[in-house]
């Protein structure tokens, strides 16, 4: 009789994943809170819709810098210490957002948040996946990423109402809490055993991901990540504004985004099990194709029908964003240990610029067709391209060619 999967994980491995997961919970909370109060900030600071969209996504500009730096440092000095520093950085950036007095100050603060959150992802994802048994790494990947959804749900439940009573500035001060987590990680969490075993081997330089034999695989992993962010971030970032602009009140928006967060949370964990069962690539394609069932009617339903919108949102996030839980494992398979932090941090976060470009593109298109239709168009386009890339296993074929050379 086969041993249950959870019995194959020892206490240090559980503690490693839990500490990385907590960091990602606060990451999701700190990063997503601005999207729930962006309409309040917009009115208070007197900024335009396109400026508000850019503020909401400026953290993506910082992500390749933060991810590359922290990833490279994690390859050199260890996953755990650099994860601690990354958590500290995004917490400080969030807290400083509360004292911003204009568009430019807020943009700088969000840039700092982007540096920290991208670094946290680079360190935490390699740390979590490396710490678990090979046959359970899709689950480790999914459990880790589910933390972002938990943080998002908490933000959706707390921040809108808190901001209405105490102001949007005080909302950002809550984002300083993760600093306390750093102290616990320093005391309790173990280092990645896989990194410890590999740390005395030759190290790669910062430019190694852009040189043979890694260049081609870096480029295709970048394209996959760019399309993934393009497929799910327009709805994540702009849906609250879409609902608010159509007269939906704050309580209903908070409820709907909580439902969306629950969809992402359960979908992330579900596809972690599916990934270990049928493989990461097949799980990707199944999730994306299924997402069209829920996406197609979403923006053509009356905003007054909140129950049906909630159902579609849950299903869309379960599928379209649920597969994001497999990304750390997906990247893990294409980079060696000595380059994994850098590869994850730099290439994944370069791809994350899709999360900046797609909402801006959707906002631009909305000037012609309305925000609902533009969100639909952009999401379908990026999802279709992602299905083609992963469905035909383009990354796997390129990887085999690069290894063979």
Swiss-Prot record:
User: What keywords would UniProt list here?
Assistant: Cell inner membrane, Cell membrane, Membrane, Transmembrane, Transmembrane helix, Transport
MF GO annotations = carboxylic acid transmembrane transporter activity
One GO term of the cellular component aspect? plasma membrane
- Give the membrane topology, semicolon-separated if more than one: Multi-pass membrane protein
Disrupted gene: phenotype observed: Inactivation of the gene in NanR-deficient cells prevents the growth on 2,7-AN and 2,3-EN. Deletion of the gene in strain BW25113 results in loss of growth on 2,7-AN but not on Neu5Ac.
Q: Which residues lie on this side of the membrane: Cytoplasmic?
A: 1-20, 75-80, 124-139, 186-214, 272-282, 329-344, 393-405
Top-level taxon? Bacteria
Known Pfam families for this protein? MFS_1 (PF07690)
Where would you find the membrane-spanning parts of this chain?
A: 21-41, 54-74, 81-101, 103-123, 140-160, 165-185, 215-235, 251-271, 283-303, 308-328, 345-365, 372-392
Q: Which CDD domains match?
A: MFS_SV2_like (cd17316)
Give the GO biological process terms: carboxylic acid transport
Principal location class? membrane
Q: Where found, per UniProt? A: Cell inner membrane
Q: Which residues lie on this side of the membrane: Periplasmic?
A: 42-53, 102, 161-164, 236-250, 304-307, 366-371
What is the induction note for this entry? Negatively regulated by the transcriptional repressor NanR. Induced by N-acetylneuraminate, via inactivation of NanR.
Q: Which family does it belong to?
A: Belongs to the major facilitator superfamily. Sugar transporter (TC 2.A.1.1) family.
Spell out the note in the miscellaneous section: Bell et al. show that this transporter allows the growth of E.coli strain BW25113 on 2,7-AN as a sole carbon source. However, Kentache et al. show that it allows the growth of E.coli on 2,7-AN and 2,3-EN, which are produced during the degradation of sialoconjugates by sialidases from other bacteria, provided the repressor NanR has been inactivated.
What does the protein in this record do?
Answer: Probably transports across the inner membrane the two dehydrated forms of N-acetylneuraminate (Neu5Ac), 2,7-anhydro-N-acetylneuraminate (2,7-AN) and 2-deoxy-2,3-didehydro-N-acetylneuraminate (2,3-EN).
| Protein name, as recorded | Sialic acid transporter NanX
Organism classification, top ranks? Bacteria, Pseudomonadati, Pseudomonadota, Gammaproteobacteria, Enterobacterales
């Amino acid at each position: 009789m086969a041993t249950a999967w959870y019995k194959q994980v020892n206490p240090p491995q559980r503690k490693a994943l839990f500490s990385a997961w907590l960091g990602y919970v606060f990451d999701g909370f700190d990063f997503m809170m601005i999207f729930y109060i962006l309409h309040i900030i917009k009115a208070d600071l007197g900024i335009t819709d396109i400026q508000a969209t850019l503020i909401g996504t400026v953290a993506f500009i910082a992500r390749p810098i933060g991810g590359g730096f922290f990833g490279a440092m994690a390859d050199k000095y260890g996953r755990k210490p650099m994860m601690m520093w990354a958590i500290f950085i995004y917490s400080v950036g969030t807290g400083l957002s509360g004292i911003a007095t204009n568009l430019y100050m807020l943009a700088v603060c969000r840039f700092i948040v982007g540096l920290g959150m991208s670094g946290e992802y680079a360190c935490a994802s390699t740390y979590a996946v490396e710490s678990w048994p090979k046959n359970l790494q899709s689950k480790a990947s999914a459990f880790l990423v589910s933390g972002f959804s938990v943080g998002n749900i908490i933000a959706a439940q707390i921040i809108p109402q808190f901001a209405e009573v105490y102001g949007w500035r005080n909302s950002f001060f809550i984002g300083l809490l993760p600093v306390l987590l750093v102290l616990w990680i320093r005391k309790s969490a173990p280092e990645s055993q896989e990194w410890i075993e590999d740390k005395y081997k030759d190290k790669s330089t910062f430019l190694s991901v852009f040189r043979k034999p890694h260049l081609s695989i870096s480029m295709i992993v970048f394209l996959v990540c760019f399309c993934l962010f393009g497929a799910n971030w327009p709805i994540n970032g702009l849906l609250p504004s879409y609902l608010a602009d159509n007269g939906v009140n704050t309580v209903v928006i908070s409820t709907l985004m909580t439902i969306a967060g629950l969809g992402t949370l359960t979908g992330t964990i579900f596809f972690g099990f599916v990934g270990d069962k049928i493989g990461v690539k097949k799980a990707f394609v199944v999730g994306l194709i299924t997402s069209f069932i829920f996406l197609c009617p979403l923006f053509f339903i009356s905003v007054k029908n909140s129950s049906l919108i909630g159902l579609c949102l849950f299903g869309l996030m379960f599928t379209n964003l649920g597969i994001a839980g497999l990304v750390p494992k997906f990247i893990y398979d294409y980079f060696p240990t000595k380059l994994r932090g850098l590869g994850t941090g730099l290439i994944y976060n370069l791809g994350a610029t899709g999360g900046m470009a797609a909402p801006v593109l959707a906002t631009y298109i909305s000037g012609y067709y309305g925000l609902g239709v533009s969100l639909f168009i952009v999401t379908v386009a990026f999802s279709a391209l992602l299905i083609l890339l992963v469905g035909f296993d383009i990354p796997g074929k390129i990887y085999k060619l690069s290894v063979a050379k």
